[in-house]
Amino acid sequence: MGVQVETISPGDGRTFPKRGQTCVVHYTGMLEDGKKFDSSRDRNKPFKFVLGKQEVIRGWEEGVAQMSVGQRAKLTISPDYAYGATGHPGIIPPNATLIFDVELLKLE
């Protein structure tokens, strides 16, 4: 499957991230059963990453690249685009499909 992007609320429809730009996002990560494993919103601190530098999982690289500034979307990410057979011990089980609620706040 890779990554499926479903818009929760639209962005400006014009400003899309490009490789090398810093994406500033708020997110909540959940397992398929709805169990939350991480949230920048809970920390009240947006998360930043540089698109194309492999600082995040492949599902984020490809999913966030399809979003425009201001957009909030549900990213459903298959294990091969997330943490695969290894998972993330103690947090994400092996072969887990992940669901992220991501809002692209701005680009830097």
Swiss-Prot record:
GO terms for biological process: amyloid fibril formation; cytokine-mediated signaling pathway; heart morphogenesis; heart trabecula formation; muscle contraction; negative regulation of activin receptor signaling pathway; negative regulation of protein phosphorylation; negative regulation of release of sequestered calcium ion into cytosol. Signal peptide: none annotated. One of its GO terms (cellular component) is Z disc. Residues 20-108 form the PPIase FKBP-type domain. Its EC number is 5.2.1.8. It is a peripheral membrane protein. The modification N6-succinyllysine is found at K53. It catalyses: [protein]-peptidylproline (omega=180) = [protein]-peptidylproline (omega=0). The modification N6-acetyllysine is found at K53. It comes from the Eukaryota. Keywords: Acetylation, Cytoplasm, Isomerase, Membrane, Rotamase, Sarcoplasmic reticulum. Transmembrane segments: none annotated. It is found in: Cytoplasm, Cytosol; Sarcoplasmic reticulum membrane. InterPro entries: FKBP-type_PPIase, PPIase_dom_sf, PPIase_FKBP_dom. Coiled coil: none annotated. Pfam families: FKBP_C. Inhibited by both FK506 and rapamycin. Gene3D superfamilies: 3.10.50.40. GO terms for molecular function: activin binding; calcium channel inhibitor activity; FK506 binding; peptidyl-prolyl cis-trans isomerase activity; protein homodimerization activity; SMAD binding; transmembrane transporter binding. Belongs to the FKBP-type PPIase family. FKBP1 subfamily. Keeps in an inactive conformation TGFBR1, the TGF-beta type I serine/threonine kinase receptor, preventing TGF-beta receptor activation in absence of ligand. May modulate the RYR1 calcium channel activity. PPIases accelerate the folding of proteins. It catalyzes the cis-trans isomerization of proline imidic peptide bonds in oligopeptides. Interacts with TGFBR1; prevents TGFBR1 phosphorylation by TGFBR2 and stabilizes it in the inactive conformation. Interacts with ACVR1B and SMAD7. Identified in a complex composed of RYR1, PDE4D, PKA, FKBP1A and protein phosphatase 1 (PP1). Interacts directly with RYR2 and RYR3. Interacts with GLMN; rapamycin and FK506 abolish the interaction with GLMN in a dose dependent manner. Interacts directly with RYR1. This is Peptidyl-prolyl cis-trans isomerase FKBP1A.
